[in-house]
Amino acid sequence: MTAPRTLVLIPARMAATRLPGKPLLDIGGVPMVVHVLRRALAANIGRVAVATDTPAIADAVRAHGGEVVMTRADHPSGSDRIHEALQTLDPQRTIETVINLQGDFPTIRPEQIGAVLAPLDDPAVDIATLAAEIHTEEESTNPNVVKVVGSHIGTTRLRALYFTRATAPWGDGPRYHHIGLYAYRRAALERFVALPPSPLEQREKLEQLRALEAGMRIDVGIVDSVPRGVDTPADLETARRVLAG
């Protein structure tokens, strides 16, 4: 069901080094960022817009009927970009919740996008995100797979204690692959972007640690699978096969 006080923002820019022009790469005749936009719209949880500093991305999104907000080019992170976009799109401050959806998740399921809102039913939670259980040793030890360590709240939610590229936690039991999809309360996003980068954030190269180090609460919804991001040519070919199928 559409939530009029929720805004889904998809930050998109041309900065990828391994896949130049990534947001506009063709998947079945449609730019990748448009696939993400369509999946966000299919989630039917609120207004959806692409936030970009690149006119070519804006033109492509508008050509497919999507909403665009232009942002500055010098933002240090996607969170800063969506904060500027929020201020531009909603100066009346009617939006209460902002979802930050990466523009390189063309195969994400609409229900997964909606699932990120569930932890915010608890008023003590500042930021919500998602994770899925890890099932292979390769995934568990891969430093490009971010692991979330947390305390269970029931069977489908964690309270995040730490995010790391290391294999963690130690010992027997499940480990969880963090999915880079966030839902912020508006006040939490505003507080987050005002904070300086934190020591652990800089050490792990994980922006979400800034919030934890500042005492903000991040809860994690557990979903059944990790949506496949597109970071390499092989990822792109996989996405093309999935979306052609």
Swiss-Prot record:
Which GO cellular component does the record give, naming just one?
Answer: cytosol
Q: Name one GO molecular function term.
A: 3-deoxy-manno-octulosonate cytidylyltransferase activity
Supply the alphabetized keyword list. Answer: Cytoplasm, Lipopolysaccharide biosynthesis, Nucleotidyltransferase, Transferase
Q: Which domain of life is it from?
A: Bacteria
InterPro entries per record? Cytidylyl_trans, KdsB, Nucleotide-diphossugar_trans
Keyword field contains Cytoplasm: yes
Stated EC number for the protein is 2.7.7.38
Pfam families from the UniProt entry: CTP_transf_3
Q: Which reaction does it catalyse?
A: 3-deoxy-alpha-D-manno-oct-2-ulosonate + CTP = CMP-3-deoxy-beta-D-manno-octulosonate + diphosphate
Q: List the disulfide bonds.
A: none
> What NCBIfam families does the record point to?
kdsB, PRK05450.1-1, PRK05450.1-5
* Protein name from the UniProt record: 3-deoxy-manno-octulosonate cytidylyltransferase
